[in-house]
Amino acid sequence: MSPSLDSSRPIVIIGAGIIGLTTAVFLLESHYYKQHRPPIHIIADHLPNDPLDAKYASTIAGAHHLSFADDGDERQRKWDMRTFQIMYEQWRQLGEESGLMALKQTELFVGQKDHLKIYEEHPNFMTLPVSELPPDVDHAVSFTSLAITPSVYLSRLMKQISSLSNYEVKIHRFHLPCLSFLSHPSITALIGQEPPAAVMICVGLGALLLGGVNDLSVYPTRGQVVKIRAPWVRSGYTRQVGNLNGGEGGERTYVIPRANGEIILGGTREDGDWYPYPREETTKDILKRAMEICPNLCPANLVTQPLSSSYGHSSILAANEQPPSHENPLDSLIIDSLVGFRPSRKGGIRLERGPDLDGNTAVIYNYGHGGQVGRALGGQPKRLLLCFARRLGFEGMDAGSNSKDFHSVIPEITYRL
């Protein structure tokens, strides 16, 4: 029997990272939900306000809007730019409460003398003259982009879920060992006796161990970053050495400021590495690379270097906050060194409908996004989810989810680790 969306049957989302939460927002924005208001439950091991955990990368990574749409991929370019426009307007309206900050972004390229054409569509785009290029840099551009503070952004998603559902969406902290456990009394006591109409599996690395999924193609890509406090730096910098390859190739060094004065420095890509603690030698390497692309991180350089420009609501320095004086100034700025596991997958993202559970519950997979969370949240997955929704009987689901509404809650973000 094909699953149907009887409005009395719950929809269950497994996972409460940025993928799971944005999936919930999408469902709540749908015409079907507004008409029928089926129960929606989120079941997760980790929640946004939990202590930092390498397996829950959503709150650890640096994040910014930085498209990697190929020049020939016109559709993805349109999605990414529309997302930027919506997010930029959110920042203009809400300021730091949005979890976003507009800033000048500088992209440095080593070993190549061109850039993605989508950068030229951003405000304030310019190509840096050769005379202004740092040592060993072959090409550079700058433009206005957006940085995100994940904890603030995720908190806003949680508030949206509550608001859109009139506090009817239930979030349960529960370790689900296997999909068949959804019929266990300990779960039915939470979600009701009716079997779920649909289960959305947004578990990231959890897909490796979740019974009934056990996807052996899932693996961690370890990322280490350094969080410092340097509120005088309000511009973002990225250096790409080698082929970009969709944002995951070569070596990338980045400096991502946040609205609260923190800065994320990174990063690393270590496939299959489960070590959850920072490595001291990696921290030193990140600091060295970050200083190469942004000397203003070191307060001593502020005497001879101009302050990074800002497009933000906040001043560069708070009234009572001055650059510290210290023998090792970068060491004095460090808040923490952090490790997170990108939920990577051989073969790429799994976004598809699988076999029904017990012949009565539709199963939709949405995991394996690695560091490219934005591709998980843009227009292409929307269309796939709509396709699955129609097969499930979500008639008219898209009627209430136009492009503007969808992108306003599900942005194109690049999570950096």
From Swiss-Prot:
**Gene Ontology cellular-component terms listed:** cytoplasm
GO annotations under biological process?
D-amino acid catabolic process; nitrogen utilization
Cofactors named for this entry: FAD
Top enzyme class, one word, equals oxidoreductase
- Its domain of life reads Eukaryota
GO-annotated molecular function = D-aspartate oxidase activity; FAD binding
Q: What Enzyme Commission number does this protein have?
A: 1.4.3.1
Catalytic reaction list: D-aspartate + O2 + H2O = oxaloacetate + H2O2 + NH4(+)
Induction of synthesis: Expression increases when grown on D-alanine, D-asparagine, D-glutamate, D-methionine, D-valine or D-proline as nitrogen source.
Amino-acid positions noted as binding FAD in the UniProt annotation, renumbered to this chain? I19, A57, S58, G62, R342, V373
If researchers knock out this gene, what phenotype do they report? Decreases growth on D-aspartate nitrogen source. Triple knockout of DAO1, DAO2 and DAO3 decreases growth on D-tryptophan, D-tyrosine and D-asparagine nitrogen sources and decreases virulence in a mouse intrapharyngeal aspiration model and an intravenous injection model of infection.
Name the keywords, alphabetized: FAD, Flavoprotein, Oxidoreductase
Similarity-based family: Belongs to the DAMOX/DASOX family.
The protein's role, per its UniProt record: Selectively catalyzes the oxidative deamination of acidic amino acids. Protects the organism from the toxicity of D-amino acids. Enables the organism to utilize D-amino acids as a source of nutrients. Enables the organism to utilize D-aspartate as a source of nitrogen and may also contribute to utilization of D-tryptophan, D-tyrosine and D-asparagine as a nitrogen source. May play a role in its interaction with the host.
Q: What is this protein called?
A: D-aspartate oxidase
